[in-house]
């Protein structure tokens, strides 16, 4: 019994020693209480509350003069308006709010040279994240190149070159690329630079578009998010007990950021929104300019424009498998010149031909797949239209913005709205003294019918864009659209109408490296109708032969008679433009009729 008690005492003593040792082991040094104060999340919360306090302050309770009262009311109204419009792509409002944030950080949050490095470790590059380094690089590039900062960063460091991946060639910027570029740059940070970078980080999480906020402002072709990676529903459905490490290593949809740059779609794999909720916040805010309606489960997509003229498309589940947005910008070329767009050897040939087609008032389609530069080329060739002509444009969403490029010309653009159909807009255009009609994009059956109407009765001539791959596909696609709308019931007659209206097809394409060029310029030649052969024989075998010939001609016309032919005038071969055909005599005569005497001599 005594031995048992002794053993229990020794066991308790041993346990006490072990417990005492563990409690007195050297613990890691606790974080300073102030460390949380300098986190971006804490600063964001403080800034949000500071703005709320400013807007909710009761000025009537303050003992101030009437002049000071009016001044504060004006400033508060200006702040409230800027907070609302900065999310629409309004650069002035964005800069105003960002400056306000800087003021709050310095005067209220007491950020100074001594503590600013605790927010972002400017003094210790090893502690910087890849996002920190990218934003620092972009900030310094912006100081030199303005809104062409991202363009300069990509070109100077060859980030738009194709790279080999497991499945083939792709365009991708990795974290290693950013680390390498950052090591090559020796940046000297003043306090103002550090404060600007931090203010931008806070702004983009508060009212901006997250990590793409500054990217969206750059002079690029576009930016999109949520278009790659594993959708959130996959993580809900997968059995996490099997291969949980594999699932966690896969990129999510909120890790997806792509930029469209000079015809190339480049994956910025080092950037991420950080969470599904942040991607959803950006999607919900980026399309709201001019109140286009609510994005909801029942209305799962929205197409709109932003304050700066960018086109934005937003989709959400259940219509799409994940939340995603697409911003397409049209300011990468400030004033599009044809000579800047068509750059290959022999470019004088297509440029001269396009010039005379437009001056000659030919109905012309600019075709090609997405991202080949159709809209940009259309904007550029407008300059060949006589300044004496008035232009009327019909679009689904404002994209061309021709008055920004040609402010001295008589130009007015209409678009379809929930209450005004495109057909009503077209009917109204006939009463607006328009000479030339331009359709931004012929993508649906009703728009095809508009185009045919405009080209036949509403204007001197028409220019439009289309996604057709070949000239034959262009004519047949428009024919099918006319049949779909019910404007025609006979396939041959509908095709004849299209072939009679459209004169030329300028087809654009791009190669795997993103190089854009005109693949061909093609003339559409309607096949002229010829009367049926007359029966001249009086009888016998000759009459039978003539009858069979006439019968054969009838059945050919009723079944497989060609309505039109195509003739390539200019083609692109091996990096060079070549003239391979001549315009028909009828088109040459029609062009000459619309030219001035000086232009005919030229």
PLM feature spans:
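The conserved Walker
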Residues: 369-370
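Walker A (P-loop) ATP-phosphate-binding motif of ABC ATPase nucleotide-binding domains
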Residues: 363
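Switch/coupling sub-region of P-loop NTPases
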Residues: 380-499, 508-510
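Conserved lysine of the Walker
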Residues: 374
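NTP-binding/hydrolysis catalytic cores, primarily Walker-type P-loop NTPases
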Residues: 519-602
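N-terminal accessory targeting/assembly segments
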Residues: 8-295
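P-loop NTP-binding catalytic core
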Residues: 244-360
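Hydrophobic anchor at the beta1->P-loop junction of P-loop NTPases
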Residues: 366
């Amino acid at each position: 019994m005594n031995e048992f008690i002794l053993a229990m005492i020794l066991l308790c003593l041993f346990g006490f020693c072990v417990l005492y040792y563990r409690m007195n082991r050297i613990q890691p040094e606790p974080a300073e209480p102030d460390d949380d104060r300098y986190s971006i999340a804490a600063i964001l919360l403080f800034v949000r509350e500071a703005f709320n306090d400013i807007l909710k302050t009761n000025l009537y309770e303050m003992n101030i003069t009437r002049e000071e009262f009016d001044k504060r009311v004006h400033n508060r109204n200006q702040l409230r308006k800027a907070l609302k419009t900065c999310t629409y792509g309004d650069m002035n409002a964005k800069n105003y709010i960002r400056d306000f944030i800087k003021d709050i950080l310095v005067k209220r949050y007491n950020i100074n040279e001594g503590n600013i490095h605790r927010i972002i470790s400017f003094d210790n590059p090893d502690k910087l994240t890849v996002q920190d380094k990218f934003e620092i690089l972009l900030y310094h590039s912006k100081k030199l190149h303005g809104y062409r900062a991202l363009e300069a960063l990509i070109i100077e460091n060859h980030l738009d070159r194709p790279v080999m991946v497991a499945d083939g060639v792709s365009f991708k910027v990795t974290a290693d690329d950013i680390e390498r570029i950052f090591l090559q740059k020796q940046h000297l940070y003043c306090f103002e630079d550090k404060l600007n970078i931090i203010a931008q980080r806070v702004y983009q999480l508060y009212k901006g578009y997250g990590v793409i906020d500054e990217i969206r402002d750059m002079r690029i072709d576009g930016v999109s998010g949520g278009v790659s990676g594993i959708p959130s529903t996959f993580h809900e459905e997968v059995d996490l007990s099997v291969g949980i490490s594999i699932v966690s290593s896969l990129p999510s949809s909120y890790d997806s950021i792509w930029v469209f740059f000079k015809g190339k779609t480049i994956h910025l794999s080092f950037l991420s929104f950080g969470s599904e909720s942040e991607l959803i916040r950006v999607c919900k805010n980026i399309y709201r300019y001019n109140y286009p309606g609510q994005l909801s489960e029942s209305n799962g997509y929205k197409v709109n424009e932003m304050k700066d003229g960018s086109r934005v498309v937003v989709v959400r589940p259940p219509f799409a498998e994940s939340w995603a947005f697409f911003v397409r910008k049209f300011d990468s070329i400030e004033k599009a010149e044809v000579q800047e767009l068509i750059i290959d050897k022999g470019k004088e040939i297509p440029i001269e031909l396009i010039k005379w087609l437009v001056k000659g008032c030919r109905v012309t389609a600019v075709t090609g797949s997405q991202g080949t530069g159709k809209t940009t080329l259309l904007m550029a060739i407008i300059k060949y239209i006589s300044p004496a002509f008035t232009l009327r444009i019909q679009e689904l969403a404002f994209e061309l913005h021709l008055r920004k490029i040609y402010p001295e010309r008589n130009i007015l653009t209409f678009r379809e709205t929930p209450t005004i159909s495109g057909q009503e807009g077209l009917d109204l255009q006939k009463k607006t003294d328009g000479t030339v009609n331009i359709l931004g994009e012929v993508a649906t059956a009703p728009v095809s019918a508009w185009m045919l109407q405009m080209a036949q009765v509403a204007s001197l001539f028409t220019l439009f864009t289309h996604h057709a791959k070949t000239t034959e596909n262009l004519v047949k696609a428009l024919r099918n659209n006319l049949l779909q709308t019910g404007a025609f019931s006979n396939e041959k007659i509908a095709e004849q109408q299209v072939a009679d209206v459209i004169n030329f097809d300028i087809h654009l394409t791009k190669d795997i490296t993103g190089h854009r060029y005109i693949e061909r310029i093609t003339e559409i030649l309607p096949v002229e109708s010829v009367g049926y052969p007359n029966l001249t024989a009086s009888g016998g075998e000759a009459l039978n032969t003539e009858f069979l010939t006439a019968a054969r001609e009838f059945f050919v016309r009723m079944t497989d008679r060609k309505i039109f032919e195509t003739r390539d005038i200019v083609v692109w071969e091996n990096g060079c433009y070549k003239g391979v055909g001549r315009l028909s005599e009828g088109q040459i005569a029609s062009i000459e009729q619309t030219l001035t005497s000086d232009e005919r001599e030229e």
